[in-house]
Each structure stands twice: as C-alpha cells, then as structure tokens.
Amino acid sequence: MNPMEEVIIDKVVVNIGVGQAGDRLTKAAKVLEMLTGHKATNTLAKKSIRDFNIRKRLPIGVKVTLRKKDAMEFLQKAFYVKDYKITDYSFDKHGNAYFGISDYTDFKGMKYDPDIGIFGMDVAIVFRRRGGYRIERRRIGSKTIPNSIRVRKEEAQDFLQKNFKVTVVR
C-alpha cells in the first residue's frame, strides 16, 4: 500500500453537553481536564430555545480536541471502558466513529466525587488519509475530495481492529 493512502486518526473530540451555563458547566470542564490533561473549551448554543431557558451563544457544553499521541492514549482508555467493542452503526459513510460513555468514573483511576456529580460524554473519532486533505482546507484553489479518496467505513473499522484490538459488533 502506498504510504500516502494509509489511514490515520486526524482528531478525537470529547464532548460533554450540559444544557445549561453555570456551576455544572465548570464541573464538566473539570472532568474533561482530569481525563485528558487538556483545557476544555465551551460550546455555544446555536439558537435560542425558550422552553429550556437557552439563549443563542450561551455556553451549554464543553469539549476537548485531541490529536496525535494524546488522541491515541485517550482512545486506549475509552476502549477499555467500552470493553474493546464498538457497534457497526457507530461509523458513518466517511469512516468517522462516534460512541458515548455513560459515566466518567468508569475510567481507570477515576473515583466518584460528590462535589462534581455524574457526567457522561460523547467521543468522536475523525479519520483521514496521510496525504491529500490539504486540497480541501487550503485557501486558494480549494476543491472537494472525491469519494474514492475519502476513508470508507470498512477501512476505519480495520484500523481500529489492528491498532486497538477493537471488535466491531454487527
């Protein structure tokens, strides 16, 4: 295989959606910082929802984006929590994978803190090939990448099976 066609992990995004600003948001940020070692950033509401008392651009969640070595280390911990299993429908047609973790205390070494409470999180894994993706991101002469070059669902599943010993449950 051409080394530029090799599938790699572009990034891992860990998100906790709190649904409200305030004290719970800072506690969720603290949980993400304990798990990943990186500072969490706020996610903002896209539109106002009167019934939930949410205004547009109000911080309602926190997220951390991990790349390279940090992403691989976090995925080892996350797949341990999921018993090294991921469902087939967790992958989209471009090979990206998404799964949820119901409680942060499931991670190794994490204990329940009554001051923080219980928080679950969503994990998104974005795959790409080693070469060719700059074409889509560059400022001048940017083009869309054809589907033949994009990472397919089966390739992403093979990558996780080889590198993390994850079984894909169909």
UniProtKB/Swiss-Prot annotation:
GO terms for MF: rRNA binding; structural constituent of ribosome; tRNA binding
Record keywords, A-Z: Ribonucleoprotein, Ribosomal protein, RNA-binding, rRNA-binding, tRNA-binding
Domain of life: Archaea
Gene3D superfamilies membership: 3.30.1440.10
Assembly: Part of the 50S ribosomal subunit; contacts the 5S rRNA and probably tRNA. Forms a bridge to the 30S subunit in the 70S ribosome.
Function comment: This is one of the proteins that bind and probably mediate the attachment of the 5S RNA into the large ribosomal subunit, where it forms part of the central protuberance. In the 70S ribosome it contacts protein S13 of the 30S subunit (bridge B1b), connecting the 2 subunits; this bridge is implicated in subunit movement. May contact the P site tRNA; the 5S rRNA and some of its associated proteins might help stabilize positioning of ribosome-bound tRNAs.
Protein name: Large ribosomal subunit protein uL5
Source organism of this protein record: Thermoplasma acidophilum (strain ATCC 25905 / DSM 1728 / JCM 9062 / NBRC 15155 / AMRC-C165)
Gene: rpl5
